[in-house]
Design a protein with these regions (language model features):
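C-terminal ends of transmembrane helices
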Residues: 2-8, 81-97, 145-156, 199-210, ...
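Predominantly late transmembrane helices and immediately cytosolic-facing juxtamembrane segments
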Residues: 2-9, 13, 214-218, 233-376, ...
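Hydrophobic core segments of alpha-helical transmembrane domains in multi-pass membrane transport
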Residues: 21-33, 79-85, 115-117, 197-202, ...
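Transmembrane alpha-helix boundary signature
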Residues: 31-43, 55-66, 82-98, 115-134
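Hydrophobic transmembrane alpha-helices of secondary-active transporters
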Residues: 54-60, 64, 69-93, 313-334, ...
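Structural signature of hydrophobic alpha-helical transmembrane segments
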Residues: 69-80, 128-142, 183-196, 234, ...
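Entry/N-cap segments of selected transmembrane alpha helices
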Residues: 90-118, 187, 191-196, 332-357, ...
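Functional cores that coordinate and move charged inorganic groups
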Residues: 148-260
Length: 449
């Protein structure tokens, strides 16, 4: 796969999905502070079930999941599944193929994860909200690439690749944090069964099984087992994605040969009257077309096929729904001054300053040491501006905030609301400031790509 084409396609997909995400976030704000706020919040607490006799697929430790838990634990597992597919593609044929090629965004991403966490821990030292230290470490790929897309071809492709790869590495870091720090009460029995099913999936991937249903059904089983094992179920999505075959069943050369043969042998049936007006095909013609259809399916790898299938579902349904459910902040109980204290300040500073300092100065250091070159057609000012966009940590930051405080009772709810305020304000200021700086420092003419 052409990695440059993949980058351009990702930016286009995320940019269009980012618009829907903005609308969903604004709606959540408006409704959470409207007369129907009680109905809005009570809806997410409704139980949800998929019952087969006494068995409920959407149950956790014997209790049915709420709508909110279904979104955060089930639908977001699909989101992390797509992230897993993207990571595997980048490692195999993308910007993470070689360490030398990927070193700049990898080092920048590590700096952009470590510094925000350290700033958060410094501001929150001795407090009861330190369990949320990972909140400002993520970069929202949809929003950040959406801002780049607003500037069109003025942005050098090297900077687009840099930010995209950085966001992917950020996702890897976020996945590791969720797996290590947000898993508890491990059930060895469920984990053992999950490992067995995962082994079957891995062997199926190695054998080149390209049936979506095979991965869908067994992946669902792994998700359920993870849900009840104590390991966060979104990790199941990532692991299942790593099992999806990246090689097509049919090589492109064989595909071309097959298509040419089928077209050359396509039956030319004789009709009475005008054959072009006939709406009925013969059996031989149908069989020939089905052979072409089958060959077309086999030349697309399961990994690429699933990525293309899931992109609209992720960008236009799952992520906007997640934002609509989780971004509702009741402003009546929060003073704006609280942004300058406690967890709101820690998250805000971590996103706006921590991400910039971590990303830019890590990049500056390895470029100055001549370990890697400056991205093509880029300047220090444009690199710094893109580093500011790294502070847009909306989706994954909200997700980690929910994991940190969602089950702590009334105290946790208050901390969660203040964390959300810091996330929204930090992401908003980072996005606006990053756009202004890029608009100021990028060349006014379109970049030749």
């Amino acid at each position: 796969m052409d990695s440059l084409y993949a980058i351009k396609k990702s930016i286009k997909n995320y940019a269009s999905g980012g618009n829907v995400l903005i609308v969903a976030t604004l709606l959540a704000f408006i409704i959470a502070n409207s007369p129907i706020a009680d109905m809005y919040f009570s809806w997410w607490a409704q139980p949800i079930s998929l019952q087969l006799g006494d068995f409920n697929l959407f149950s956790h430790n014997g209790h049915p999941m709420t709508v909110m838990e279904f979104i955060n634990d089930a639908l977001m597992a699909i989101f992390f599944f797509s992230i897993g597919l993207e990571i595997k593609r980048e490692v195999l044929v993308g910007e993470l193929t070689s360490i030398k090629q990927a070193l700049l965004p990898i080092v920048a991403a590590i700096g952009g994860m470590v510094i925000p966490v350290l700033l958060f821990m410094y501001i929150g030292r001795g407090s009861d909200f330190l369990r949320g230290s990972a909140i400002p470490m993520a970069t929202d790929i949809a929003f950040s690439l959406g801002v780049l897309a607003m500037l069109g071809k003025r942005v050098p492709i090297s900077l687009k690749i840099f930010l995209t790869t950085l966001a992917v590495v950020d996702d890897i870091g976020g996945i590791l944090v969720i797996a290590i720090f947000y898993s508890s009460h491990i059930s060895v029995t469920y984990l053992f069964y999950a490992a067995g099913i995962f082994l079957i999936l891995w062997l199926g991937g190695r054998a080149g099984i390209n049936s979506k249903m095979f991965y869908f059904i067994l992946g669902g089983v792994v998700w359920f087992l993870f849900l009840n094992s104590g390991i966060h179920p979104t990790i199941a999505g990532v692991l299942v994605a790593f099992c999806i075959p990246a090689k097509p069943v049919l090589a492109t050369t064989r595909f071309i040969s097959t298509i040419r043969d089928e077209i050359a042998n396509f039956p030319q049936e004789q009709f009475h009257g005008d054959s072009d007006s006939s709406i009925m095909l013969s059996k031989d013609q149908i069989n020939c077309l089905k052979s072409i259809e089958s060959a077309s399916d086999k030349v697309i790898s399961p990994l690429q096929d699933l990525e293309d299938t899931l992109h609209p579902v992720i960008n236009y349904l799952i992520i906007p729904l997640f934002a609509f459910a989780n971004a509702g902040i009741v402003l009546s109980g929060i003073e704006l001054s609280s942004l300058f204290t406690g967890i709101s300040l820690a998250v805000f500073v971590g996103l706006l300053f921590g991400k910039f300092v971590g990303i830019f100065f890590s990049s500056w250091l390895i470029i100055k040491l001549k370990i890697v070159p400056m991205p093509t057609h880029s300047t220090w000012k444009s690199l710094a501006s893109v580093s500011v966009l790294g502070g847009i940590g909306f989706t994954v930051s909200l997700f980690i905030a929910n994991l940190s405080f969602g089950n702590m009772g009334p105290e946790g709810i208050e901390l969660l609301e203040h964390a959300k305020l810091g996330i929204v304000m930090g992401s908003l200021v980072s996005g606006i400031l990053g756009y202004i700086l890029l608009n100021l420092f990028l060349p006014k003419q379109q970049e030749v790509e």
